[in-house]
């Protein structure tokens, strides 16, 4: 399954993009919004939505402070989305997870490394630390500086269920194809490229079929 990544200037624009596309899930990048007025219009599709308000330091598109992000998490949780995404290292991660549990909303606990890929021992320790918080899904994304980095990340699938793991960057594209087969779902942009090395949904699915049938 593929989650379409939605970037937009406001909730209304995001809604129109969702209405005119055909994905089973959508990651709504709240950090791309210039305005949050009328956020509730997205409730129509809430069961298909992942809400992600990242800080700039976590790969966010626009700057968001933690107070604003917490407010956004509270607002979108009232819509009962499929998931909210929060970065493992974020100062508000624990609070977000507690709020999500109260509201019955799934959590994707994420880790991103925009510079490289740690050795496998460190990745496995990271995975175990993240599992202790008991999120519904763990997402580990690193940057491939060599083809072997893909193998280190993909080995994590042997140690966890409900895991999304792949590498960013041109050298990481093959791991995205494997994640389309091994993970509960993976990501593809509705338009452009939201993260380095992203593949369009059609290309991702074509390559997945070529490799796995």
Curated annotation (Swiss-Prot):
One of its GO terms (biological process) is aromatic amino acid family biosynthetic process. HAMAP family: AroD (MF_00214). It catalyses: 3-dehydroquinate = 3-dehydroshikimate + H2O. This is 3-dehydroquinate dehydratase. The active site is at residues 112, 139. InterPro entries: Aldolase_TIM, DHquinase_I, Type-I_3-dehydroquinase. SUPFAM superfamilies: Aldolase. Homodimer. Involved in the third step of the chorismate pathway, which leads to the biosynthesis of aromatic amino acids. Catalyzes the cis-dehydration of 3-dehydroquinate (DHQ) and introduces the first double bond of the aromatic ring to yield 3-dehydroshikimate. Gene3D superfamilies: Aldolase class I. Keywords: Amino-acid biosynthesis, Aromatic amino acid biosynthesis, Lyase, Schiff base. It comes from Thermococcus kodakarensis (strain ATCC BAA-918 / JCM 12380 / KOD1). Pathway: Metabolic intermediate biosynthesis; chorismate biosynthesis; chorismate from D-erythrose 4-phosphate and phosphoenolpyruvate: step 3/7. Belongs to the type-I 3-dehydroquinase family. The gene is aroD. Its EC number is 4.2.1.10. GO terms for molecular function: 3-dehydroquinate dehydratase activity. 3-dehydroquinate binds at residues 27-29, 54, 176, 198.
